Amino acid sequence: LSRFPIVDHRYVRFPDSGNDYLQADVKVGDDTVRIFSVHLQTSGISGLRQRFRKDHGRDVPVERVIGELERNSRIRAQQVREIRAVIDSTHYPVIVAGDFNDTPSSYTYRRLKGGMTDGFRAVGNGFGGTFRYLGGVLRIDYIFYDDRFAGVGYYMPQDDVSDHKAVVAELRFRRI
């Protein structure tokens, strides 16, 4: 849904995964902006814990947790490489937003961000935690934008629709 005309789009579902991204070219005045909405591989821990408790009646051994984290991290890294290649090949102004399922210290964050600006770091405030559980301090949902934009505002509306908080960035074009 957009108040601006969508002039082109592409939906990509990652193989062997419930994850995907949508790439949309949106006409804003005389400019076309390429927006990526991404949902990357989860850590898999919640599902693993539920299955293990159901099957074995106890919590998951730490070795299994580490293995699951490593496996899903590799999957996320491949997804990021694919998206980054598309970003690098575009000449339009770019916005990347979504559920990265990884922290700001991760390969996922650094590789996908590249030279773009993290909206929260630029104009947000507080901890910026987007995952509702584990104390609410994990930031795993992001909005990145390239240098043709300037951040005006960044906030998280109050809703309880998901285990993740929504993030909103207000941007304006930089006129060079």
Regions found by a protein language model. Give the residues of each.
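Glycine-rich, phosphate-binding/catalytic loops in enzymes
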Residues: G18, F52-K54, R111-G115
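Short, charged/polar low-complexity linear motifs in solvent-exposed/disordered segments
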Residues: D25-V26, R51-K54, A169-L171
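Metal-dependent phosphoester-hydrolase catalytic domains
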Residues: A77-Q78, E82-I95, F100-I176
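Soluble or luminal CAZymes and related metallo-dependent hydrolases
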Residues: F14-D16, R71-E82
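Structured beta-strand-rich core segments of catalytic domains in phosphoester-bond hydrolases
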Residues: L1-L48, A150, Y155-D159
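Short charge-dense sequence patches
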Residues: V26-V28, V33-F36, R58-V62, V94-V96, ...
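A solvent-exposed, charged loop/short amphipathic helix patch at secondary-structure junctions
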Residues: Q50-L69
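Short aromatic-enriched loop/helix-cap "lid" or pocket-rim segments at secondary-structure transitions
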Residues: S46-Q50, Y107-Y109
